[in-house]
Amino acid sequence: MSKNLTAIANRLDKRKQFLKRACKNLGLDIPGNDTLHKPNPWEFLVSQKYHLIWCNVFKAASSSWMYNFNILAGYSPDFLRKTKQVPLTLARQKYPRQTVESLKKAFNESLAFLIVRHPLERLLSGYKDKIEHALPHSLHKKLGNQIIMKYRPNAKNGNFGKSKVPTFAEFILYLLDCVKNGEVLDMHWTPITEFCTPCMYDFDIIAHTETLQEDQEFLIYKAGLQGVIKPEWKNSGKGITAQQIEQYYSQLTRAQILQLYHIYRYDFELFNYTLTGYLDVGIMDKDPAALLEAINMKELTKKYDHVDSYNNAV
């Protein structure tokens, strides 16, 4: 292991304690009936054989750990390499959806973990993977066409310009409108707080993509899975660079970036992320009132439902 176990354990414990304090300070640890205060067991995978629980967050090392959980379920590496079936579909054949009650019981006898990522880096990754590089004839390709028709000037007249792919700025206009109108968000950019309700569950390990190699090495060690799965990150080469962050977020105004902060506010605050490196690359708003309005904006987060139709696009 690249660092001694004690140092890694201390870092992970600090994250866990930080999350508990933040949950309490934000009032998110109090059970209720809305999506932020009600346990959401929908995206959890529970390995009863290995006593391991994972809340799958799309665009946060999800491909790697979906592969790992399929290995734990008994699929061979050779089968997983050759099959045309979607990894999530395979996983759900072995790991049924949990109820609140069954997941609570599993937490009492398992090691539970969550992998998080900077909210705006995750958002950009979702855009690049599912919109910019959408597969032909896919739901995301259809969504991209709809975004262009709505947000690109003259597109309705057949003038798409140089690109038939939505720009990041066009995608963000779509996302902001979705939230303002209370529409369903795609799972690849739904806030983690909505997905995994981390204040409602006592996760043992909160891994960050920034330190993923060490975090998952420690996780595999704690779960006793050395020799069963490997601490790999399958899409690490596709990670978002600082240059890409500047390239894409410089298309947005600072008011828009602040609006995004409000959408992902709890992901920022619960997992100790900031706007450093994002807000400063945004375009200065011509109207100071727009920036002031964004700063004073009430939280935009609304109830998001889960859309199974997107489950084929992991």
Where are these regions (language model features)?
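Membrane-interface amphipathic segments in extracytoplasmic regions
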Residues: 1-314
